A protein has these predicted regions:
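N-terminal export leaders
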Residues: 1-2
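C-terminal motif of bacterial Sec signal peptides marking the signal peptidase cleavage site
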Residues: 7-9
């Protein structure tokens, strides 16, 4: 019974709590490590050293957005520092902004270990420390209305707000910053915040759903599970399981449907229903669903793993769009052809997918992450590499979140919106899945110019340097540097779309390479070993199913979705032939890739990658009118993806 744990309050076991004001020394946590009972993959990346065309994009965003965000938004923390006396106009999700930012900054630091990025992250930790209440509270709301107090007030009519949701993002960002940089203060602040939430809700006998907006506020279960791993505090594990097994089924008034409902995610998953068929299919729920992966890892309870698997496959089969984005609008609808996905959808989808990749060790999942990264995620970043869009459309144009979501902003925080605060986490999330460590070796998922530094399960430092122009072409050269010679398995992701892949190790051709799998190379690895890969970069397609959006097709070159810009003479209705699309000619251009093609009427058309096609606000098309020369592929679990039609 979770409510019987820690009745004297949660926090008494934390030594030497921080002294106000900031400048205190946080204790190092020495709890024994929580055992991984199911042997999940881990991210042991130290520095990705990302280079090439993608590296230029991400580094530019790091320079003009990440490293200047506090300077450009000087009142970002004002409501946190002065919750009882501030005049800021606050959206109900105001508390998420600094946490989302720090989560992205942590990942961004993994890209290049830029000391200016570390300085920004450390400064945010200091501001969190200064703002934290004596009871651990880490949000922007006054005592009278925080948590569920406004909802419970009989003299107030309100739908409530996203208080534990905002604190969840702050706790997660602090936790990840601690993991990546070793900043003990970040972990200490996160623990104090979580203890405050535990004391108010669990010890105080309040339900999390009493705040309403349960699809958001139940994300705090993920924080409880993660910090159980970090600290070993059993009450955190009990709280996480209580939220999943009880609060996910509790009813609350839903703002969107104006009905009483429960999220019911576990029930839906175990009944084999897709996420859109659950009680609450909003995108925010994916952070709550991440609790399942951690609980599976620390308990070994197969029910959590089964639910995680069911939910992921249900989403990829019914709600993943041609861009690799998730859901239509702001949630799952069961329609992969729907118009547009919010940037925040994409960030949550990639976080959830990364968890499932670590659990499943299935290269299919890594293929989906690559699809999402190169298209939906990069596609959320506009020209200038500073601003992100609110909505990513398969066809149409992109507009800055600073315009569409201006109502989220406030004096001294004019850049702030849910998507602008979250966008950097989306594009930097590649550092979370690029190269993973298992108990018997490494899993290489990302191909692109880089010099990735990681370690094996035994603690041996290994660097994989990639020299390549991928995805512009399919040639990749990998040079190994190992601190010590070591025998382990290096698993190379062979994309499902690369039908004929050639792999060489130190010049010797490898046998048995198959598309859609990890190719395993078991040997004693030493400095100077060289791996060469040549991927099959033939065009492949997603033929829209009959009865959906008409005779349309999406064209892919490797992981890149292709699109063309419309004009007075080149319209969304312009028709192409499949054979012509298959034989497009590569040319030099402004995109990551560019191709020349002709329409059915003989018009010359330039195709580029989806990211490049709309970054300046131009109208574009990625669902292309074409003859039905290909049979459609229906979704099948573990089968050939719908976007890999030949």
């Amino acid at each position: 019974c979770v409510t019987a744990v820690g009745l004297a309050g949660c926090g008494a076991g934390i030594p030497n709590g921080p002294k106000k004001p900031n400048g205190s020394s946080a204790p190092a946590y020495t709890a024994p490590p929580v055992e991984d009972k199911v042997d999940m993959l881990k991210n042991e990346m130290r520095n990705m050293n990302i280079e090439g065309a993608v590296g230029k994009i991400l580094t530019a965003n790091e320079t003009v957005w990440v490293q200047k965000v506090l300077q450009d938004n000087p009142r970002l923390f004002d409501a946190f520092l002065h919750p009882e006396e501030n005049d800021l106009a606050k959206a109900m999700w105001h508390g998420e902004f600094p946490g989302k930012l720090l989560s992205g900054i942590a990942q961004t630091y993994l890209l290049n270990n830029d000391p200016r990025t570390k300085e920004t992250g450390d400064r945010m930790v200091a501001l969190f420390q200064e703002a934290q209440g004596e009871d651990g509270y880490l949000g922007p709301w006054s005592e009278a209305v925080r948590y569920n107090k406004d909802v419970l007030d009989p003299n107030t009519e309100t739908w409530g707000k996203w208080d534990t949701w905002g604190q969840y993002h702050c706790i997660y960002g602090l936790y990840r910053w601690y993991q990546i940089t070793g900043n003990q203060e970040a972990l200490h602040i996160a623990v104090r915040a979580l203890d405050g939430i535990y004391n108010y809700f669990i010890v105080g006998g309040q339900t999390f759903v009493s705040q309403n907006w349960a699809e958001c506020n139940l994300a705090i279960g993920h924080a409880f599970a993660l910090l159980y791993e970090a600290t070993g505090k059993p009450e955190y594990l009990q709280a996480a399981e209580y939220i999943v097994n009880e609060e996910w089924n509790m009813e609350y008034p839903d703002f969107y449907s104006k009905t009483i409902l429960s999220c019911g995610w576990m029930t839906a998953a175990l009944e084999g229903k897709a996420f859109y068929e659950s009680g609450q299919p909003r995108w925010e729920g994916l952070y709550a669903l991440e609790t399942l992966a951690v609980l599976y890892r620390v308990t070994g309870n197969e029910t959590y793993g089964e639910a995680m698997e069911s939910l992921w496959w249900g989403m990829v089969g019914t709600d993943r769009h041609n861009t690799g984005s998730f859901g239509t609008g702001e949630g799952a609808t069961g329609d992969p052809y729907g118009h547009g996905s919010e940037t925040c959808n994409i960030v949550a989808w990639m976080a959830f997918s990364t968890d499932y990749l670590k659990m499943s060790k299935n290269s299919y999942v890594a293929d989906e992450l690559e699809l999402s990264f190169y298209n939906a995620s990069l596609g959320s970043l506009l020209a200038g590499e500073r601003e992100f869009t609110y909505m990513n459309h398969s066809d149409g144009s992109r507009e800055s979140a600073l315009i569409i979501l201006e109502g989220h902003s406030f004096d001294g925080g004019r850049d702030m919106s849910c998507c602008q605060a979250n966008g950097n986490r989306g594009i930097s999330q590649v550092a979370e899945w690029a190269l993973l460590t298992g108990t018997d070796g490494l899993y290489l998922n990302y191909y692109g110019a880089s010099n990735m530094q990681t370690q094996t399960a035994g603690g041996n430092s290994v660097t994989l340097r990639q020299e390549t122009q991928y995805p512009k072409n399919g040639a990749v050269k990998i040079t190994v540097t190992a601190e010590q010679e070591e025998s382990f398995v290096l698993r190379l992701r062979i994309p499902v779309w690369s039908e004929q892949t050639v792999v060489r190790v130190n010049g010797e051709v490898c046998e048995g390479v198959r598309a859609g799998t990890y190719y395993e190379i078991s040997r004693s690895w030493k400095t100077g070993d060289v791996i060469e890969l040549h991927f099959d970069m033939q065009m492949h397609f997603w033929m829209a199913e009959k009865g959906t959006i008409g005779q349309k097709v999406s064209v892919y070159y490797g992981p890149l979705l292709l699109a063309y810009q419309t004009s007075d003479s080149l319209r969304p209705t312009t028709r192409f032939e499949i054979d012509t699309l298959r034989a497009m000619e590569p040319i030099e251009g402004d995109g990551l890739v560019s191709f020349r093609c002709t329409s059915s009427k003989g018009e010359a058309v330039i195709f580029t990658d989806y990211y490049s096609a709309g970054r300046n606000g131009e109208a574009f098309v990625s669902w292309i009118v074409a003859g039905r020369d290909l049979e459609t592929i229906s979704f099948e679990k573990y089968g050939n993806p719908v976007w890999n039609n030949r």
